A protein has these predicted regions:
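Bacterial N-terminal signal peptides
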Residues: 9-16
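Residue-level micro-sites within transmembrane alpha helices that shape
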Residues: 4, 175, 222, 241-242
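Zinc-dependent metalloendopeptidases
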Residues: 20-225
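Bacterial N-terminal signal peptides that target proteins for export
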Residues: 1-8
């Protein structure tokens, strides 16, 4: 199987990567490095939205423009993204609420705390996506996720060997958006290599997320109403490629 990078993109922020005590999971570089109350082990309710095609992402690179997920991903992408959110809320004290995106540029809009969109990265088979760490992380970029529009995407494992499963990549990037860094644990979702050997968060990933937000209290991802989805553009800031790499975005 070809390996692809999963990149964690983060605005320059104070704080070094820190491994949580007695575990292999790695926390992100921001402080407090989570949503909701700043104390580790406390839950959070987090909003998310889908950026529309044409939304500016010029703070990433000159001329950058977002493409909605609906405009480059296959049918079923929305269910895959929702399932990735649910995979995390089922193992930690997290609730996700869909909101309408305000259409403002990347790192300016204040609609969804997690904003999904896509744009070209570095051609196919390299970095697949990137995700921005939680606050404090430079204005409103925190939590945003972008997919590489030059790569091919699919729903489910198998099939096209040159395409990448939306759920698996999204779940990895959400991990970054919620506060986890890359781990050296081989069979972990937060390892920087794309794989179809397992699906979703594994033991080390779950331990890390529960360290940040505590164990689950309720199921946290209600199905979005059909009417609420009409007209919403899909975008994502995930980071899978041959290897997930950390890329820094300078603060303007």
């Amino acid at each position: 199987m070809k390996l692809r990078k999963i990149a964690a993109a983060a605005l320059l922020a104070a704080g070094a990567l820190t491994a949580a005590p007695a575990s292999a999971f790695v926390l992100g570089p921001t402080s407090p490095g989570k949503w909701g109350p700043p104390a580790f082990g406390t839950g959070a309710t987090i909003s998310y939205s889908f950026m529309a095609t044409g939304t500016s992402c010029g703070q990433e690179f000159a001329g950058c423009t977002i493409t909605a997920l609906a405009d480059f991903m296959p049918a079923g992408y929305l269910g895959a993204v929702t399932s990735a959110l649910a995979a995390w809320s089922s193992v930690a004290n997290l609730t996700f609420n869909l909101v309408a995106d305000d259409g403002l540029p990347f790192n300016v809009g204040t609609s969804g705390e997690l904003r999904f969109g896509g744009h070209p990265f570095d051609g196919p088979f390299n970095t697949l996506a990137h995700g921005f760490f939680p606050p404090v992380n430079g204005a409103t970029a925190a939590g945003d996720m972008h997919y590489d529009t030059d790569d091919q995407w699919k729903v489910g494992f198998g099939g096209n060997p040159n395409a990448f499963d939306i759920f698996q990549v999204t779940a990895h990037e959400i991990g970054h958006a919620l506060g986890l860094g890359h781990t050296a644990v081989a069979n972990s979702l937060m390892n920087p290599f794309y794989t179809e050997a397992f699906s979703g968060p594994q033991a080390d990933d779950i331990a890390g997320m529960q360290f940040i937000y505590g164990p689950p209290q309720t199921q946290g991802v209600p199905e979005p109403a059909t009417a609420a989805l009409l007209g919403l553009a899909c975008a994502a800031l995930g980071a899978f490629g041959r290897r997930r790499r950390a890329a820094a975005l300078p603060v303007a």
